[in-house]
Amino acid sequence: LGATERKDGYLEGSGYLVSWCVGHLLELAQPEAYKEQYAKWRYEDLPILPENWKYEVPKDKKTQLALLCRLMKDKRVDSVVCATDAGREGELIFRLVYEYAGCNKPMERLWISSMEDAAIREGFDHLRPGSDYDKLYDAAVCRAGADWLIGINATRLFSVLYGVTLNVGRVMSPTLALLVQRESDIESFISKPFYVPEITCGGFTASGEKMTERSEAEKIRMDCDHNSAFVRSVEKQVKTIQPPRLYDLTTLQRECNRIYGYTAQQTLDYVQSLYEKKLATYPRTDSQYLTKDMQATAASLILWLRDNMPFGKGCAGEPDIDRVT
């Protein structure tokens, strides 16, 4: 963009002012912001259901938020570009600041999944109307509200009932329940022997169904001993095994845990670092597909890997990018 002149909290140049958010600059306020009596955890006050959401600014984010508000109101600024992460949370981070600043200037959206210079330039050449992502913003607000309602009310309820702080969350609690159920299943599991009759005919082995009674399996074995077997029919099928899809964050986290023993957070930290170094696409996604504008880049990258990396030897043909976009 040519914004190379460094200022206090932003960059300037070539008609652009470029600044940044440091995570969420606005957060949903705690219950006591709605009523002072909510400062104490009491059963009688539940459920707490705000009619309109209030937001508060973390102390360490006040300076940057004030700067962004000032820049949006700058008379030199005639439009605003949202360039946060291409996802629900990125949309929420920007929109809350935009609304908090009372900004009504035209807003456009930079939607890219790569930090490469070419991808960024391409994205700025094809900015989209901010209104295209209104539903995404609505979804983010709903997610944040649901987390607040369940987390605040359920945590206070169970903490008051049991006399100890018990944290409850929309995602955390069901996940914990799955772990508890799995652990319970493992502890209560009782192994039982089973038997599978098999017939070996040269290089071919035919297997029967599992049996829990040894006597049944023994009877089949005795009936087959010293007798001949006949192949009555042969059915041949040609099957195509599709290659796996691209990774989304959850799939990648599972794979890295299985192979390397990484925690989910470790995997996210590593792939986030790769993303910032322009070596991976946007990681915080549940999609296993690339956007259409990445087709050419993806194809050229695969061809380069095929021609220059040891594992590419023997690969032939052209990559079918349509499968992953």
Model-derived segments and their meaning:
Residues Y100-K105, R128, N153, L157, ...:
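A generic secondary-structure signal for well-formed alpha-helical elements
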Residues L1-A144, W148, G317:
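Intrinsically disordered, low-complexity regulatory segments
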Residues T84, R254, R284:
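Short glycine-centered, acidic/aromatic-flanked micro-motifs in structured strand/loop junctions
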Residues Y133, Y137-D138, L149, Y270, ...:
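Extended, highly charged linker/hinge segments and catalytic-adjacent loops that couple domains
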